Amino acid sequence: MAAKDVKFGSDARVKMLRGVNILADAVKVTLGPKGRNVVLDKSFGAPAITKDGVSVAREIELEDKFENMGAQMVKEVASKANDAAGDGTTTATVLAQSIVTEGLKAVAAGMNPMDLKRGIDKAVVAAVAELKKLSVPCSDSISIAQVGTISANSDETVGKLIAEAMDKVGKEGVITVEEGTGLEDELDVVEGMQFDRGYLSPYFINKPENGSVELENPYILLVDKKISNIRELLPVLEGVAKASKPLLIVAEDVEGEALATLVVNTMRGIVKVAAVKAPGFGDRRKAMLHDIAVLTNGNVISEEIGLELEKATLEDLGQAKRIVINKDTTTIIDGVGEEDAIKGRVSQINQQIKESTSDYDREKLQERVAKLAGGVAVIKVGAATEVEMKEKRARVDDALHATRAAVEEGVVAGGGVALVRVAAAIVGLKGDNEDQNVGIRVAMRAMEAPLRQIVDNSGEEPSVIANSVKAGEGNYGYNATTEQYGDMIAMGILDPTKVTRSALQFAASIAGLMITTECMITDLPKDDKADLGAAGGMGGMGGMGGMM
């Protein structure tokens, strides 16, 4: 076992604080509308340029192991805030730095670290309750666009695109961000349920101008097995032919004689049919077939539940207004499924999302919810260069997370104002003893730090503006973009309540642990010279040749 280096008390805390400050100072320059860029060196390709706090934090590893421990603990604050709300990472880092700095000063002055932590925790609980009182619901497109704009570093086009996407696919719908091919940002909306499976034969194509199959008011046959024998399909095909409607077959696979017969019937115009493979694999395929069944008010023909393909009737088939199939995708538009059944299926999948422990499974389940709930929107980010594209995509991702958080828990005044108002509201809070009162004051002082940093980054004097904001009431604050005072919500400067709350809670949690640290242990660096000397001693083995 390697020898360890151990530091105690103030020696440990000074090193840890140095690491905290290095990471926080690198991250906090990005805060606010006039935040600066940080350039990150990459092992290959062009350097990355970012204004995203968590991207900066993730890059930092320090040479001194004790300093690095401090930096990594603050990195955890940024990561946790990012995971919980998708934004607010820089705010969380600034809060954590302030609490740690002020808290360690109090420890050095002889305060009890445990009581300090209890005081900080009390202040945060009271502050979160006050934040909820200040919160305003965020449901209309204008406020959603404003939140998106602020989170994308005052880029109005991004805010408008996100609001438009939410209008089209609903608050629960899936919105994804991709790298586009042009210079402009674009929004691409797929209505209805789309899955990644195309036609099984190009002979099904009935719209040669765009190489697609379009079926109007079709029946939909869902089968949980391979179909290779046409005899199994005949009863369904005869029923559909009598009804004079087209048919879409979704099965594990359609092959051989069955596929050939379907193609011949389609080309002769006897029955208009198209066949596609079912989406997904294994259990996920079964689940997605059931989703399609609920959406189209049909049944999945599966021998597991005693339904045989030969005995299937028109009542077992689903229906939709329109289906469009191309080489790679199938889109079912306006399925005739009952609304209550669809809602029940969505809530069932939402329950699975809550219970899921795998990020991949959770993502796939969320995709299924979106497909049932209303559609998928894709924001395609445009930029002139690859470096700009990557930076912009990260900002759009942040903005999307922030708007989701705003819809979930509402919004508060932005620009650091909400935390200043919260600190003023809990000014009468008292702890069980004087050390706890100091902890409460440490937390309250930290709540001013984001406002001060935003002002500092904009090139103004933090103390002057912080005092002016504190003298005001309600949503009165400082707009760093226009350098004017006024009502922050009226000016469209909003922060999601969830983002502000998460930033404060995670910052206080990890900063509290750092204040109560008394000992730090790390591996001693290995002495490479000693290792080389030991290896050099093996040279004498060459003399063993004489043993022969």
Swiss-Prot record:
One of its GO terms (biological process) is protein refolding. Its EC number is 5.6.1.7. It is an enzyme of class 5 (isomerase). SUPFAM superfamilies: GroEL apical domain-like, GroEL equatorial domain-like, GroEL-intermediate domain like. ATP binds at residues 30-33, 51, 87-91, 415, 495. Its main location: cytoplasm. It is found in: Cytoplasm. InterPro entries: Chaperonin_Cpn60_CS, Cpn60/GroEL, Cpn60/GroEL/TCP-1, GroEL-like_apical_dom_sf, GROEL-like_equatorial_sf, TCP-1-like_intermed_sf. It catalyses: ATP + H2O + a folded polypeptide = ADP + phosphate + an unfolded polypeptide. The keyword Transcription regulation does not apply. It holds the Pfam family Cpn60_TCP1. GO terms for cellular component: cytoplasm. Keywords: ATP-binding, Chaperone, Cytoplasm, Isomerase, Nucleotide-binding. GO terms for molecular function: ATP binding; ATP-dependent protein folding chaperone; isomerase activity; unfolded protein binding. The keyword Zinc-finger does not apply. Belongs to the chaperonin (HSP60) family. Together with its co-chaperonin GroES, plays an essential role in assisting protein folding. The GroEL-GroES system forms a nano-cage that allows encapsulation of the non-native substrate proteins and provides a physical environment optimized to promote and accelerate protein folding. Forms a cylinder of 14 subunits composed of two heptameric rings stacked back-to-back. Interacts with the co-chaperonin GroES. This is Chaperonin GroEL. The gene is groEL.
